[in-house]
């Protein structure tokens, strides 16, 4: 019984720290107020393969690679990102030009690499 009490005391002492950590994280997300779009790169496709953005509205793209190193290149939005194998790259962008654009993987990732692209539509 006495072995449980020190463990329980330690656990109870840690709970406020855990709550403070969660509160801080939640506040940072709300304070940022920038929409996040998750994009997954996997041989030989991006998912989703189409997204729509608003001209002049800032958005954060969270680029994940599930397998090998990929690229994310889109000249009109001045994006040229490397997504290392098994990791995540974040980029913040504010589109200044309306239109429909094609982003490509510009890092050779295998035989069907040339077909790896996605459509990004920027609306007024």
Residue positions per predicted region:
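Extracellular/periplasmic metallocenter environments
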Residues: 85-124
